[in-house]
C-alpha cells in the first residue's frame, strides 16, 4: 500500500498492510520565515517518512496580523510566549476587520506550504493546521476571553464570524497548491475551558461552518486539546480522524471507536513516554494501542505535538513500531446507536 491508500483504508475501517503513523512538532525560529519553515518540515518528513505530514506554523499565525505580540522563550512544545494581547474590550471585538489572507502571516504559511507540497513525496498527504475561531479569539484576548464571552456574547459572535471568514478564505487559497487536508485544532471543547452549553453556542457552529466547507476527498483531522474533553459533542463532526490526549483523559482508544466512525490517532504519551521514556516504552505503548483497537481505524501517534527535545531514538522507535505490527485483525468496535 502507498501512504494515501493506507490512510484511506484506515479511516474507512478496511484492511491495512500496517497501521499508519505520524508525529508533528513545532519549529521555533524557523516558523518566522516561509523558507525556513518549509525546509524544516521537508527535512522532518524525509527523515521519518510519516504517512501524513501535519504542517505546524507558529500557533498565532492566523491572528498575528491583528497585532498579537509573541516571543520565543524556550517552551518544550516549541510554542511562543505571549507578550501582549490586542483585544480587551467589547468594541475591540467588533472592530476586528477581515484579513487579506494573501499577505502577512497567512501568506507566509501559504508560501511554506507551497514549497512543502512541491518537495515531499506526492504520496504523503500534507495537512495545514487550522485553529478553530474560538481558539483564535483566545490568542487575541488571552484571559479576557471568558469574561468577554459571558458579558458581551453578541460582540464575541461578531468576532468569531470574522475569524471564521478569514479561515475559510485561507483554506480556499490552499486548494490549488497540493494541500490534502487540514488538522483542525479545537482547544475549548473541554470542561476546563467552558461549559458544554457555552461550547454549543460559541464553538460548534463556527467549527461546522469550516468543516462542512472543506473540499471532498481531503483527509481532515480533528484535534481535541486538553483534559476532560467533550468528545461526544464533536464525534459527529465531518472529519476522517480524531486526535486527543487518549493516554491522559477519557475516552480511551477502544471507547472512542464506538463513538466515532473514522480513525483514531494516538497511543503514545507525549511527555512521560515520548519525551522522558525510552524506545522500549515506545514499543510497549504502541503495541498496547494496537491491542486496544485491533489495528482497526487506528493511526499511531501522540495526543499532541512532539516535544522539540524528545530524543531522536524515541521518534525512530515510534516510526519503526508499526513495521512489526500485523495488518488489522477484526475487532468488536461497533458504533453506539
Stretches with model-predicted labels:
Residues 29, 91-95, 320:
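Polar/charged alpha-helical tracts
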Residues 77-115:
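A gly/proline- and charged-residue-enriched helix-loop-helix capping module
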Residues 15-88:
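N-terminal capping/small domains of soluble enzymes
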Residues 1-28, 40, 100-337:
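Active-site loop segments of alpha/beta catalytic cores
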Amino acid at each position: 500500500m502507498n501512504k494515501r491508500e493506507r490512510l484511506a483504508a484506515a479511516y474507512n475501517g478496511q484492511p491495512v498492510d500496517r497501521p499508519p503513523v505520524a508525529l508533528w512538532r513545532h519549529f521555533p525560529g524557523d516558523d518566522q520565515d516561509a523558507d525556513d519553515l518549509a525546509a524544516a518540515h521537508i527535512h522532518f518528513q524525509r527523515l521519518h517518512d510519516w504517512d501524513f505530514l501535519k504542517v505546524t506554523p507558529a500557533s498565532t499565525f492566523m491572528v498575528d496580523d491583528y497585532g498579537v505580540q509573541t516571543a520565543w522563550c524556550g517552551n518544550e512544545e516549541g510554542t511562543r510566549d505571549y507578550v501582549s494581547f490586542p483585544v480587551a474590550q467589547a468594541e475591540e471585538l467588533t472592530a476586528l476587520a477581515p484579513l487579506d489572507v494573501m499577505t502577512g502571516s497567512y501568506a507566509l504559511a501559504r508560501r511554506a506550504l507551497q514549497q512543502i507540497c512541491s518537495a515531499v513525496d506526492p504520496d504523503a498527504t500534507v495537512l495545514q493546521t487550522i485553529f478553530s475561531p474560538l481558539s483564535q479569539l483566545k490568542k487575541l484576548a488571552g484571559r479576557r476571553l471568558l469574561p468577554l464571552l459571558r458579558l458581551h456574547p453578541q460582540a464575541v459572535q461578531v468576532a468569531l464570524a470574522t475569524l471564521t471568514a478569514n479561515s475559510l478564505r485561507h483554506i480556499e487559497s490552499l486548494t490549488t497548491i497540493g494541500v490534502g487536508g487540514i488538522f483542525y485544532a479545537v482547544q475549548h471543547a473541554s470542561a476546563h475551558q467552558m461549559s458544554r452549553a457555552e461550547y454549543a453556542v460559541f464553538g460548534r457552529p463556527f467549527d461546522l461552518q469550516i468543516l462542512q466547507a472543506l473540499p471532498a476527498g481531503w483527509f481532515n483531522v480533528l484535534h481535541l486539546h486538553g483534559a476532560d474533553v467533550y468528545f461526544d459533542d464533536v464525534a459527529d463532526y465531518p472529519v476522517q480522524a480524531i486526535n486527543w490526549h487518549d493516554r491522559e483523559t477519557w475516552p480511551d482508544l477502544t471507547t472512542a471507536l464506538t463513538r466515532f466512525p473514522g480513525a483514531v490517532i494516538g497511543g503514545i504519551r507525549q511527555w512521560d513516554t515520548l519525551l522522558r521514556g525510552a524506545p522500549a516504552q515506545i514499543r510497549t505503548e504502541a503495541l498496547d494501542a494496537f491491542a486496544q483497537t485491533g489495528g482497526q481505524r487506528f493511526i499511531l501517534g501522540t495526543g499532541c505535538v512532539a516535544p522539540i527535545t524528545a530524543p531522536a531514538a524515541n521518534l525512530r522507535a515510534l516510526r519503526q513500531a508499526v513495521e512489526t505490527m500485523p495488518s488489522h485483525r477484526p475487532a468488536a468496535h461497533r458504533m453506539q446507536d
